């Protein structure tokens, strides 16, 4: 069953004002252009510029820094958004994710495929066949891969709509995490679905993809 508890440390809640655009637009980067454990924070900053937000937290005592980039458009009803995040430990990339609700590159996925994934049996190759290409990948130490030797594939999607004559924004976010051991066999799966409704307000810090650990 999907969990509906708050995510750690941030839940995506896109808050806009009027017809403003928030952030500079960007396209989906090619995952092959990143190498986990090797790509540096300096390279990401040079490539994408100043992030919308930046946070730091500890995973098993190890400091992980996350850079987040966001772009949104305020429309009549739907409020499409793109976000991407990059996590680093000691200056090297340990994870990245991309989320979009724009029609051109939306990252919707079928969470029902989770029912066919078996812990201790399903391989990463089989999981990719069932769910498709992930929006993000993480290695230890990160919020999705919290033990040495583990890696995780992440699937993220968010949809926002204006309610109450445009005075309220309702956002529904889905994040599926599939963690693998050193043999690329599934050890954990975690599906989180959250819905939030907030007054429209320009708050860039809330436009960040969620980073929740496995439970």
Language model features by range: what are they?
Residues 2-11:
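Bacterial N-terminal signal peptides that target proteins for export
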Residues 10-19:
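Bacterial N-terminal signal peptides
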């Amino acid at each position: 069953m999907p969990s509906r508890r708050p995510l750690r440390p941030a839940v995506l809640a896109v808050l806009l004002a009027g017809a403003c655009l928030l952030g500079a637009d960007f396209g989906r980067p090619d995952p092959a252009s990143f190498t986990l454990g090797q790509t540096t924070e300096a390279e990401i900053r040079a490539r994408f510029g100043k992030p919308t937000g930046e946070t730091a937290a500890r995973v098993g005592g190890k400091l992980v820094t996350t850079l987040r980039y966001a772009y949104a458009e305020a429309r009549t009803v739907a409020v499409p958004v793109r976000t991407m995040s990059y996590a680093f430990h000691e200056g090297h990339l340990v994870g990245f994710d991309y989320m979009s609700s724009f029609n051109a590159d939306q990252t919707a996925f079928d969470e029902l495929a989770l029912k066919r994934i078996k812990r201790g049996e399903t391989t990463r190759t089989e999981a990719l066949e069932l769910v498709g290409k992930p929006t993000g990948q993480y290695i230890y130490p990160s919020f999705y891969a919290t033990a040495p030797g583990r890696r995780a594939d992440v699937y993220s999607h968010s949809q926002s709509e204006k309610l109450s004559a445009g005075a309220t924004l309702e956002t529904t976010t889905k994040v599926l995490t599939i963690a693998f051991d050193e043999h690329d066999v599934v050890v954990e799966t975690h599906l989180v679905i959250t819905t939030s409704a907030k007054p429209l307000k320009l708050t860039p810090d809330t436009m960040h993809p969620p980073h929740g650990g496995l439970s």
